[in-house]
Design a protein with these regions (language model features):
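Acidic, divalent-metal-coordinating active-site segment for phosphoryl/phosphodiester hydrolysis
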Residues: 163-176
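Active-site catalytic pocket residues across diverse enzymes, especially alpha/beta-hydrolases
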Residues: 115-119, 178-179
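Generic alpha-helical structural context detector
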Residues: 132-135, 152, 173-176
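Short alpha-helix boundary/capping motifs
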Residues: 79-81, 129, 139, 175-179
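Conserved non-catalytic scaffold segment of RNase H-like nuclease domains
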Residues: 1-117, 124, 140, 144-162
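Short, glycine/acidic-enriched loop or turn micro-motifs at the edges of active sites
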Residues: 11-13, 132, 170
Length: 179
């Protein structure tokens, strides 16, 4: 796959809408052309211990951050002219790029739920899953299909796992190799 946006969310608690950081990597013609990272004030705005242990973010990190609609608007505004995100309605548009995520079920659910939380229209974005692709591509040759394992198998050293931008960059690397 040569044109896509790799995306990753971290959440503050068990609610999929509680996105507290986003990382996104735009890939065009197989090359990274733009990255985006932002902290987000989560909704609901509380942190569970187990989430803090995963990504290291705490309430103080996002207390003054923008809420999701403003972060989303900023991310979309930073896309190069003419580029937009592929949805089921724009699947034939050559300037529409799909999302790619590792365990896309999680990230697509987070995106759908945070859109719903803020009463934003969700256009059924198209997602491709590097986790599913790795299970097919590496069938049986990897110990597991966790992001850092698959990234290493694709020649990428993921050193800051569970930082949304680092994870999105690893996902982009994987997608360029196996999708």
């Amino acid at each position: 796959m040569k044109d896509f946006i790799a995306i990753d969310f971290e959440t503050a608690n068990e609610c999929p809408s509680s996105v507290c950081s986003i990382g996104a990597v735009l890939v065009r013609d197989g090359e990274i052309v733009k990255t985006f990272y932002s902290l987000i004030k989560p909704e609901p705005d509380y942190y569970k211990w187990f989430c803090q242990q995963v990504h290291g973010l705490v309430h103080e990190d996002t207390d003054c951050a923008e809420v999701f609609p403003y972060v989303w608007e900023r991310m979309i505004a930073e896309l190069p002219d003419g580029i937009h995100i592929q949805s089921e309605d724009t699947s034939d548009d050559p300037d529409a790029v799909p999302f790619v995520a590792h365990n896309a079920g999680f990230d697509s659910r987070c995106l759908r739920e945070v859109f719903r939380c803020y009463r934003m229209d969700y256009p059924e974005f198209v997602f491709h899953d590097t986790l599913a692709a790795s299970r097919s591509h590496f069938s049986g040759s990897l110990e597991n299909h966790q992001l850092q394992t698959v990234a290493a198998a694709c020649g990428y050293d993921l050193t800051n796992h569970h930082h949304a931008l680092a994870d999105a960059e690893a996902c982009a690397w994987i997608a360029r190799k196996i999708l």
